[in-house]
């Protein structure tokens, strides 16, 4: 049985839990998706999702709740972790526009610009190309970060908006600038969960 924790300190948690449940069904696997708030919940976990929200707040609360270092260590050891929007920022090695003193997990060798797509009013939806599917994916961008640079060839693009890379993977780590959990399309959650099977 797969156990998937969604970091539940702030952000779009319930939508990710529902998307993971849809992905379990599509994959035909038994699984449990839950809000991850305390370090002891990391025992016997198979995958972690870092949701959207506000990256500075999520980073601070993860540190306060004792989740930051254990999650970083699990990611370094190969546990599958997916970050969406603010979660991508937390995973990034380098962040433009970071708040002073903000800590990052630094599990993805990318440079991101924190609020490249502007304010809430600059949010948009657009069809995205995926590396593993011919069908376009409905991309929902809300004050999204931008992937400015892939820092080495270990980082592979998996999603594009036109010519722009908006999703990447590096080993078992996935970072997405958009919100797949705000659609009914579970393909990206399914792709992520395959890393934990």
Curated annotation (Swiss-Prot):
* Protein's pathway: Cofactor biosynthesis; pyridoxal 5'-phosphate biosynthesis
Q: Which GO terms describe its cellular component?
A: cytosol; glutaminase complex
Q: Which residues bind L-glutamine?
A: 53-55, 114, 142-143
What reaction does this enzyme carry out catalytically? aldehydo-D-ribose 5-phosphate + D-glyceraldehyde 3-phosphate + L-glutamine = pyridoxal 5'-phosphate + L-glutamate + phosphate + 3 H2O + H(+); L-glutamine + H2O = L-glutamate + NH4(+)
* Biological processes per GO annotation: glutamine catabolic process; pyridoxal phosphate biosynthetic process; pyridoxine metabolic process
Respond yes or no to whether keyword Zinc is given for this record: no
Pfam families in the cross-refs: SNO
Q: Which InterPro entries does the protein's record reference?
A: Class_I_gatase-like (IPR029062), PdxT/SNO (IPR002161), PdxT/SNO_CS (IPR021196)
GO MF annotations in UniProt: glutaminase activity; pyridoxal 5'-phosphate synthase (glutamine hydrolysing) activity
Q: Which residues form the active site?
A: 85, 179, 181
The record's annotation in HAMAP family points to: PdxT
> What does the UniProt record say this protein does?
Catalyzes the hydrolysis of glutamine to glutamate and ammonia as part of the biosynthesis of pyridoxal 5'-phosphate. The resulting ammonia molecule is channeled to the active site of PdxS.
Q: What family is it from?
A: Belongs to the glutaminase PdxT/SNO family.
What is the name of the protein in this document? Answer: Pyridoxal 5'-phosphate synthase subunit PdxT
Organism (species): Thermococcus onnurineus (strain NA1)
Q: Write the lineage as a comma-separated list.
A: Archaea, Methanobacteriati, Methanobacteriota, Thermococci, Thermococcales
């Amino acid at each position: 049985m797969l156990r998937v924790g969604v970091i539940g300190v702030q952000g779009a948690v319930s939508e990710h839990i529902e998307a993971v449940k849809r992905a379990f069904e599509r994959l035909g696997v038994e699984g449990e998706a839950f809000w991850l708030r305390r370090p002891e919940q990391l025992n016997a976990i198979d995958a972690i999702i870092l949701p959207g929200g506000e990256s500075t707040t999520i980073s601070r609360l993860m540190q306060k709740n004792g989740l930051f270092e254990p999650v970083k260590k699990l990611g370094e050891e190969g546990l599958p972790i997916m970050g969406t929007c603010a979660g991508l920022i937390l995973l990034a090695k380098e962040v433009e526009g970071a708040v002073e003193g903000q800590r990052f997990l630094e599990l993805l060798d990318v440079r991101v610009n924190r609020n490249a797509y502007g304010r809430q009013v600059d949010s948009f939806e657009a069809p995205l190309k995926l590396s593993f599917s011919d069908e376009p994916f409905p991309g929902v961008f809300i004050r999204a970060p931008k992937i400015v640079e892939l820092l080495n060839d270990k980082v592979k693009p998996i999603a594009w908006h036109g010519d722009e890379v908006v999703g990447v993977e590096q080993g078992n780590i996935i970072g997405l600038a958009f919100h797949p959990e705000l659609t009914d399309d579970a393909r990206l959650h399914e792709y992520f969960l395959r890393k934990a099977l």
